């Protein structure tokens, strides 16, 4: 007798405020919707400012994001011990076959998930920037996380170059 195939469980981490418009959030939403249509079990962990108006039942709010000025813009991220506890709980309860972390080399839920996770981890890199002293200063903290990734994806050649310049590793461009 054939056993029915179990649906692959994929945990996706969005580093930026889910309810703030942005390219990373749109990328994650479209990918999640496509994977759900294909029969995968998807759970997205993200910072959320307004949980009451959250429309996607597959998004798990991790807490309110904190605005941080970066490169002339403001990134709404979540980081710290309370966020780390929520990340570990989400990973444990999700029992994921695979984790997909977006921007795993910035202080955010993605970095916390990388530190907490065991098993296959895919990292997608979106950012592109010139070499920055701050990255070199915290490189020893970030390097093990980047090295822990089973696979690395860059959304552009510029993002790939940024990854290579800062972490001396490579990624597949999609």
Please annotate each region the language model reported:
Residues 7-8, 14-19, 28-29, 33-81:
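N-terminal strand-loop element at the rim of the active site
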Residues 15, 102-103, 125-129:
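Histidine-centered beta-alpha loop that forms part of the nucleotide-sugar donor binding/catalytic region
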Residues 50, 105-106, 113, 158-160:
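Alpha-helix capping/helix-boundary segments
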Residues 80, 101-107:
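Short His-centered aromatic/hydrophobic patch
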Residues 129, 135-152, 166:
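Membrane-proximal helix-turn-helix segments that form the acceptor-binding/catalytic region
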Residues 148, 160-174:
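Helix-loop-beta element that forms the nucleotide-linked donor phosphate-binding surface
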Residues 85-94:
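Short, well-structured alpha-helical segments in soluble
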């Amino acid at each position: 007798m054939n056993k029915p195939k179990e649906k692959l469980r994929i945990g996706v981490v969005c580093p930026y405020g889910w309810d703030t418009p942005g390219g990373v959030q749109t990328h994650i939403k479209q990918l999640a919707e496509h994977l759900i249509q294909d029969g995968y079990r998807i759970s997205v962990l993200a910072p959320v400012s307004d949980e009451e108006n959250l429309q996607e039942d597959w998004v798990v709010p991790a807490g309110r994001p904190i605005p941080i000025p970066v490169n002339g813009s403001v990134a709404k991220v979540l980081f710290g011990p309370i966020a780390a506890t929520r990340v570990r709980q989400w990973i444990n309860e999700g029992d994921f076959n695979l984790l997909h972390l977006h921007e795993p080399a910035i202080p955010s839920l993605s970095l916390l998930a990388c530190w907490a996770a065991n098993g296959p981890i895919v990292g997608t890199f979106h950012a592109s920037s010139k070499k920055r002293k701050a990255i070199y200063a915290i490189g020893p903290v970030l390097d093990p996380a980047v090295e822990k990734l089973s696979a690395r994806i860059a959304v552009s050649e510029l993002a790939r170059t940024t990854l290579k310049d800062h972490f001396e590793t490579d990624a597949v461009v999609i």
